[in-house]
């Protein structure tokens, strides 16, 4: 038996990283349009639109993006749409690509199992990726997975008995006695697999102004900062970009009281009693942290938005206790009726109505 030790390897919270980057972008002027479905992308002529006739051919080419919330016009598009990247690429380019959703299922174990391994343990990579791994998380849980199953369904992020069984079997070959009785949830995600096994990054030859970031699967998260710089460099060459003297390069994170000393924590509660009102008992998340998550740049508007910013609902009971209390806070702070709140945006509403009203309606029938 032999292993390859990588002392510089590390782990990061993917939710926290993405939210931090997005909040920093928002502070620096980036606009976000959530729950907005792209329906069509068409090439257009900016010269015709603006009445200008002195532009080069590349400068004349632009895009009209029709969405569920209106029409947008853009001179450049960066296509970082994951499993849907092929759909948008193929709307504008004659050189078609295909992205296959590759499903990966996982087990997440309770923090009581978090020290079962101290490093990420990878199996030998194969045709479908790096295989089933066993890894600690930055918050002290144990993560086991993923599988690799190619699908036709670009929304197929469901778990299966076969997939979870595969995790049980393969993970035990690398790490013995994994306490799978401590599993608190299982989930699945989709990786954007390009049929040529390539990251497709760059401006399309036949569509100036359209920049692909397609087929970004493992190690996509690790590669993301470098990919971002690469794409920024492409845009810098094509646009007259100037450094913003008011750019804010740092972002203040959500206060984590668990990192404070007892004296500092007590002083925090004295100044703001909301930090002493525990909402999530599994993860010990206070009302103060939830309020911070709601009212910061690009603040949370859903139950999952709170969970991914604060970990309220990520513990052993998986929101069984705290979700009603979190929803009450969201409803109060956003001035939105409880019936309109969602789990993760879109149509994922959590409440259908008041039970007494439903029963009265049935009696009337």
Show where each model-derived region lies.
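Flavin-dependent oxidoreductases
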Residues: 41-43, 66-145, 149-160, 169, ...
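Short Fe-S-cluster ligation motifs
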Residues: 307-323, 340-362
């Amino acid at each position: 038996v032999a292993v390859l030790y990588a002392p510089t390897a590390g782990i990061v919270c993917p939710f926290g990283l993405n939210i931090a980057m997005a909040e920093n972008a928002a502070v620096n002027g980036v606009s976000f349009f959530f729950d907005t479905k792209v329906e069509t992308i068409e090439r257009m002529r900016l010269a015709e639109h603006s009445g200008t006739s002195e532009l080069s051919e590349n400068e004349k080419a632009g895009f009209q993006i029709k969405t569920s919330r209106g029409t947008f016009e853009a001179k450049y598009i960066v296509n970082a749409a994951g499993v849907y990247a092929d759909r948008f690429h193929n709307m504008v380019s004659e050189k078609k690509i295909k992205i296959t959703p590759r499903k990966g299922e996982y087990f997440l174990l309770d923090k009581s199992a978090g020290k079962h391994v101290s490093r990420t343990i990878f199996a030998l990579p194969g045709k479908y990726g790096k295989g089933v791994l066993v890894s600690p998380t930055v918050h002290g849980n144990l993560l086991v997975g993923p599988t690799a199953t190619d699908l036709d369904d670009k929304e197929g992020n469901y778990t299966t008995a076969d997939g979870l069984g595969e995790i049980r079997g393969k993970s035990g070959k690398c790490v013995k006695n994994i306490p799978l009785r401590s599993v608190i949830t299982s989930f699945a995600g989709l990786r954007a697999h390009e049929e040529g096994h390539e990251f497709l990054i760059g401006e399309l030859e036949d569509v100036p102004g359209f920049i692909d970031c397609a087929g970004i699967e493992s190690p996509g998260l690790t590669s993301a900062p470098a990919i971002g710089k690469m794409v920024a460099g492409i845009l810098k060459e094509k646009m007259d970009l100037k450094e913003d003297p008011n750019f804010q390069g740092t972002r203040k994170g959500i206060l984590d009281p668990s990192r404070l000393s007892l004296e500092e924590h007590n002083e925090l509660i004295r100044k703001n009693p909301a930090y002493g009102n525990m909402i999530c008992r599994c993860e010990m998340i206070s009302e103060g942290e939830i309020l911070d998550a709601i009212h910061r740049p690009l603040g949370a508007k859903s139950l999952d938005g709170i969970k991914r910013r604060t970990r309220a609902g990520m513990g052993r009971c998986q929101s069984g206790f705290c979700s009603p209390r979190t929803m009450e806070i969201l409803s109060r702070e956003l001035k939105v009726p409880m019936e309109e709140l969602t789990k993760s945006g879109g149509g994922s509403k959590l409440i259908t109505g008041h039970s007494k009203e439903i029963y009265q309606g049935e009696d009337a029938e």
